[in-house]
């Protein structure tokens, strides 16, 4: 599916702990737009500590390379300001090079699915983005 069409098909959908949470949207975008399969997480962890522990497992996944800048199709991990460095990531999305330099397609509560620039994410207290390019 075309990236713009995918964004239009999911934008504003609500966040759901047992449905469309941030990792599930990331997986869905990677599969539908790029034909890549990423590991499943059936239910979003409730506590911040559990989310951080789960996201830390990304370092064990050999299916991607790390990029120092955003690029089309990269999985982006984020943390909240004050919660440590990128190793304490608790959120994910997919960077899509649409509308100029691009933006992150992600979903959180209570906002729902959004397509936001790094500046917009920073205003919403998301920080320390790290970009991982799936190679499989």
Where are these regions (language model features)?
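A broad detector of the eukaryotic-type serine/threonine protein kinase catalytic domain
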Residues: 8-12, 78-81
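Short amphipathic alpha-helical patches
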Residues: 29-34, 49-57, 128
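Non-catalytic ligand/cofactor/substrate-binding and regulatory segments of enzyme domains
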Residues: 1-11, 114-136
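Solvent-exposed, flexible loop/coil residues
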Residues: 14, 19, 42, 59, ...
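Glycine-rich phosphate/pyrophosphate-binding loops
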Residues: 36-41
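...with weaker cross-activation on analogous glycine-rich loops/strands in unrelated enzymes
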Residues: 43-113
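Active-site nucleophilic cysteine motif
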Residues: 14-34
């Amino acid at each position: 599916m075309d990236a713009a069409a995918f964004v239009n098909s999911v934008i504003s959908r609500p966040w759901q702990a047992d449905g469309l949470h941030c990792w599930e949207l990331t997986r869905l975008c990677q599969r539908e737009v790029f034909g890549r399969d990423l590991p499943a997480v059936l239910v979003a962890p409730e506590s911040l500590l559990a989310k951080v522990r789960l996201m830390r497992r990304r370092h064990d996944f050999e299916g991607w390379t790390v990029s120092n800048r955003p690029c089309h199709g990269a999985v982006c991990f984020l943390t909240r300001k004050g919660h440590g460095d990128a190793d304490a990531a608790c959120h994910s999305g997919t960077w899509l090079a649409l509308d100029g330099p691009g933006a992150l397609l992600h979903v959180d509560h209570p906002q729902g699915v959004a397509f936001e620039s790094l500046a917009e994410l920073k205003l919403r207290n998301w920080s320390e983005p790290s970009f991982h390019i799936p190679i499989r």
